[in-house]
C-alpha cells in the first residue's frame, strides 16, 4: 500500500515535464492543481532526420565563365583585288627649256655631199666591174650557177628581183654582163604557154630564139637569156647564172 502514493507522485511529475516547453510556470500555477511543480527547461535533443527532397525548381539562367587569354595572331589572308585608280594629281610646273647640241649646218651639208660623192664613186666602180646600168635599173651578177628558186631567193635577200628585160636596151645590157646563160624573171608555171613576169604581168617585150618556146619535155617553165641575146625556155630545176635587177 505504501507504493501507490509514490507511483502517483512519479506520474504527475512526468506530466508536468511534458508541459514545461509550452506552458510557463505562472500559467501552470493558475491552471494546474497545487501538486504540480514548475522545473527548469530540459536539454535539447539530437537533430532529427533529413526531410524528403522538395519539387524540382525552374532552370536558371546560363552562367558566364571567365574570359580567356587572347590567342596569337592568325595567318595573313590572300591579297585583295586592286583598288580603283585614284584621281589625277595636280598638274606639275612647266619645266625649264631643254638644251640642244650646237649644229653646224654648213658641216652637215658638206658631209652629206661627201657621202653622195662616195656613193656615186662606188656605184660607178660596181657598174664598171660587176654590173650594167640602163636607165633607172642596175643589173648585177655574183657569177654563181644555181636553180631558179635559189636565184629568186638570192635577189630577194638583197631587196632586188630576178633580171627581166623590158626592152632591147635592157636585154643588151644583160647580154653584155653575162658570160654564161642566165635565168630571167619570166615563167609560164601557172598557165602553160602564157609567159609572165614574177608579178604576174604579161610580157610587152620578147626576144625568143627560133622555134622557141617549145616546152620540150613538158617541163620547160623558165626562160634563159642565151649568150647571143636570144631567149629559150628550160626546166626551172636546171642550174644557170644568177642575175639580179636593182632599182636606182
From Swiss-Prot:
Keywords: Calcium, Coiled coil, Collagen, Complement activation lectin pathway, Complement pathway, Disulfide bond, Hydroxylation, Immunity, Innate immunity, Lectin, Mannose-binding, Repeat, Secreted, Signal. Its main location: secreted. Residues 42-99 form the Collagen-like domain. Residues 134-245 form the C-type lectin domain. Transmembrane segments: none annotated. Residues 43-107 are annotated as: Disordered. Residues 112-130 form a coiled coil. It comes from the Eukaryota. Residues 1-20 form the signal peptide. One of its GO terms (cellular component) is extracellular space. Hydroxylation on proline residues within the sequence motif, GXPG, is most likely to be 4-hydroxy as this fits the requirement for 4-hydroxylation in vertebrates. Calcium-dependent lectin involved in innate immune defense. Binds mannose, fucose and N-acetylglucosamine on different microorganisms and activates the lectin complement pathway. Binds to late apoptotic cells, as well as to apoptotic blebs and to necrotic cells, but not to early apoptotic cells, facilitating their uptake by macrophages. This is Mannose-binding protein C. The gene is MBL2.
Amino acid at each position: 500500500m505504501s507504493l501507490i502514493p509514490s507511483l502517483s507522485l512519479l506520474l504527475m511529475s512526468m506530466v508536468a515535464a511534458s508541459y514545461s516547453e509550452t506552458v510557463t510556470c505562472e500559467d501552470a500555477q493558475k491552471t494546474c492543481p497545487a501538486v504540480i511543480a514548475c522545473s527548469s527547461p530540459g536539454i535539447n535533443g539530437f537533430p532529427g532526420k533529413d526531410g524528403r527532397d522538395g519539387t524540382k525548381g525552374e532552370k536558371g539562367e546560363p552562367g558566364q565563365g571567365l574570359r580567356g587569354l587572347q590567342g596569337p595572331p592568325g595567318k595573313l589572308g590572300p591579297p585583295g583585288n586592286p583598288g580603283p585608280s585614284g584621281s589625277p594629281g595636280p598638274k606639275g610646273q612647266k619645266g625649264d627649256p631643254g638644251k640642244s647640241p650646237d649644229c653646224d649646218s654648213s658641216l652637215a651639208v658638206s658631209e652629206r655631199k661627201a657621202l653622195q660623192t662616195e656613193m656615186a664613186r662606188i656605184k660607178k666602180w660596181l657598174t664598171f666591174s660587176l654590173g650594167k646600168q640602163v636607165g633607172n635599173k642596175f643589173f648585177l651578177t655574183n657569177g654563181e650557177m644555181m636553180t631558179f628558186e635559189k636565184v629568186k631567193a638570192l635577189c630577194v635577200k638583197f631587196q632586188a628581183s630576178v633580171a627581166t628585160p623590158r626592152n632591147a636596151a635592157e636585154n643588151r645590157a644583160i647580154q653584155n654582163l653575162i658570160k654564161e646563160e642566165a635565168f630571167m624573171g619570166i615563167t609560164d608555171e601557172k598557165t602553160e604557154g602564157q609567159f609572165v613576169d614574177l608579178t604576174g604581168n604579161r610580157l610587152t617585150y620578147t626576144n625568143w630564139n627560133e622555134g622557141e618556146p617549145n616546152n620540150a619535155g613538158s617541163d620547160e617553165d623558165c626562160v634563159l637569156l642565151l649568150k647571143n641575146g636570144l631567149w629559150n625556155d628550160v626546166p626551172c630545176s636546171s642550174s644557170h647564172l644568177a642575175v639580179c635587177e636593182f632599182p636606182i
